[in-house]
């Protein structure tokens, strides 16, 4: 807006901000995505390009031979985290959300704060830098809380994550044909739990260690698998990344008002497009491979589908569910059914789907869903002591 702190900034400040962000993104792309982008270009154009480490070339005295290898790019540890924090600092200072640090040592301390450097949480400048100039404080209660965070993280990592990986997940994934379908499915669910326990365990330990040093890091996970929809999941999973993407990517893209600077009358469409772009880039941030790109795209699509689904009429939802279930059942039958039975299968599927749809409609008219919801609320209130 015209009253925002950055609206009156001189053009030089905007140029320095843009230059800083471009350098940060350039370094991230160079070290983390060089192989990925090179492979994409080679696959699309049929070329034979190879990565070339310009920093090793300079370190060798502008020579391809020497102490450093020019044909390999070594990924610095934690680069995804601390470059995001560097961008957070420059953007927050530009926006007037935080005062600049007093010296280069304070800036280096913020960027390289070791507890969260490798696995997060991602700390924004306006959350951490003011703590640099506060007196150290560690009461008995805070000490106990810090120890709890550390022990909680160790239990998640050692007792849960590592145990599942060694005794179940690795065995099934290495030889899936030796196990039943149920065991393979169970291993997939266990892998989801392992990823959560591993990641959140590390961040819990980081929060506890930082607290012992007098610093407070934001909570990074809030029981994400209790979420009821994709939107809620991303408010509970890797919360520091979600907040970063919202503040420095989704809102600058236009939020629900515009897309890439172009105003849109349909705010829902604008929000959906920007959400998808944000999740797509968020997926790529997690790793330099198509798996993460697809994963980000699926999360973005899931959020859009949920938003559309949440606004639908109940009858339309039931109709779509009927068509979906009938289609899945039909597809399953067609895999083992001769072609001449195809029309019979479709007839059965449509009949069953229509029957289920009207059963749901009848139950709704009788008010059973409302009664069940009321009973559920009373039971929850009784359990919680309300």
What are the roles of these predicted feature ranges?
Residues 1-379, 383-386:
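Membrane-embedded transmembrane alpha-helical bundles that form the catalytic cores
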